[in-house]
Amino acid sequence: MRTQSRRRPRVTLAMAAAGTLLAPLLSGCWVGAGGSGSGGNSINVLMVNNPQMTELQKLTAAHFTKETGIKVNFTVLPENDVRDKISQDFANQAGQYDVATLSNYEIPIYARNGWLHTMDSYVADDPAYDEQDVLKPMRQSLTGDDGKLYGQPFYGESSFLMYRKDVFAEKGLTMPEHPTWTQVADLAAKADGARPGMKGICLRGLPGWGELMAPLTTVVNTFGGTWFDKDWKAHLDSPEFVKATKFYVDLVREHGESGAAQSGFAECLNNMTQGKVAMWYDATSAAGLLEANKSPVKGKLGYAPAPVEKTESAGWLYTWAWGIQNASRNPDKAWKFVSWASGKGYEQLVGDTIGWSNVPAGKRASTYTNPAYRQEAAAFQDMTKDAIESARPNDPGVQPRPAPGIQFVGIPEFTDLGTKVSQEISAAIAGRQSVDAALKKSQQLAEKIAKEYEGR
């Protein structure tokens, strides 16, 4: 693995509200009990309202509390709200919440700021947890600049290419075992119009750092581009970044879905489900929805690794994980909860009581050797595991990076920068401006951020 330059970015206390990468896992709001600080034999947990989280909430009292005697007070909020509340409580080190759900975007930043309790000693003293069973890229993405572990994944995802194998067979098309983007563009052109109203591919064009910029940044990486070099020089107007962006914009304009500039994860999911596109590059978590029992495309799909050009792999990495606040007055009890929620036993519990399709997968190697899970996810589980294991959060491109991240740059400012840049590129997808014009503006935005970090 290439040695990465990991300079220490400027500490900021305010975290911008984030977009979503795990769009299929979002649901409505429910707020549970949360006190002004945990005490006695209880802990306070602040978490996002994704379905798998609320399922955990329902199972906690009858299993975790019954086994340990520790009561868990949950506060459950929508994603943007929970991110805001977590950043406020953890930045102030108020200690109101012992545990919170954080992604691999926030955890290294929070660790750098001193807001999180390290988990190394807990892992070492808890052999039953089996930290080595956690997929290596997940462990890497939840490790701080100091090499210490600050989070444990609850579930995770990467990205890959989904395609209609029946349509490909009808058209005499073959998906390469390890496709390049050049090959994918050729296949998209040939599959375009394969059936009435069917387009060749669906790619996100909806503005958002976690919408359009997620897949596009993986394309930039494998084309040889980067947002910033190791010295914090902005490179959005570099030949590689420009080539990748023009490729992406041209592909989606020529052979992509209608209304691409307003299409995010949800819209592409609908297009794929309804047979309106022959291919879709997006989150591995989408496969479970496409292969659901009532899905009209169940059994009709094939899966391939994220397309590449100059790199060996290109898939992104994202996880909802658990972090323990440094100011927690109950870190030992907090670890017991984290160990239970992210442990092998909890996955077995969910599989036995709710169903294996509901298991919070994407984090442990043992999940993918479990016969019950393998049967449930036979169509895509091997490709999903391979995608996650091949993700390189510290070395996603062809050059050293100043901060970790594949589909994002691991600095607090990226949520705002990424969203603004995505708006410019989405306008190019819509035909309102050229890619060159979009990236000229974007370079200026990135240079302002770069000045904050240069020389550090």
Give the role of each language-model region.
Residues L187-K190, D231-Q262, G302, A306:
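Glycine-centered hinge/linker elements that transmit conformational signals in sensory
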Residues A124, A286-V297, K310-W320, I324-T419:
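C-terminal lobe and pocket-closing loops
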Residues Q88, Q96-A100, A128-V167, K199, ...:
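A structural signal for short loop-to-beta-strand junctions that line the ligand-binding cleft
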Residues D120-V134, E177, I201, G205-L206, ...:
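Short, solvent-exposed loop/beta-turn-alpha elements that line the ligand-binding surface or hinge
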Residues N104-S158, L212-P215, K298-A304, K385-R392, ...:
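Hinge/lid segment of periplasmic solute-binding proteins
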Residues H63-V134, A169-G172, N271, G275-M279, ...:
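Extracytoplasmic "Venus flytrap"/periplasmic binding protein-like
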Residues R2, K71, A169, R392-R456:
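Conserved C-terminal helix/tail region of periplasmic/extracytoplasmic solute-binding proteins
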Residues T143-F154, S159, T182-A234, K246, ...:
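Extracytoplasmic/periplasmic solute-binding protein
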